[in-house]
Amino acid sequence: MPMKVLDMFCGMSAFRTAAELIGGFSFIGHCDNDPTAIAAYRTLYQTEGEYFCNDARAVNTDEIPDFDLLVGGFPCVAFSAAGARRAFDDPRGTLFFELSRILEAKHPAY
């Protein structure tokens, strides 16, 4: 049975592409706020019927199907030398807390 995966901050599908190459994974949903990235993601993969949200802060955990694994490459520019290093003063710097909120609500196996 494939491991069910929720792909947060999915961008253009790096995690999904790797998982597809490895095999044994089934994606139940994805989330990203970049329309261009989502368009590319949906061009590469059949996502009809998957859970989708374009804002991690708006994810309603009651609407997400159960999953085994959450993956997510949350934005790091708030902490990076490539950014202004505003850390938690930058709204992007708090997005990883959304992963924690989802994990606490859903209790996936991994």
Regions found by a protein language model. Give the residues of each.
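Conserved active-site and SAM-binding loop architecture
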Residues: 1-110
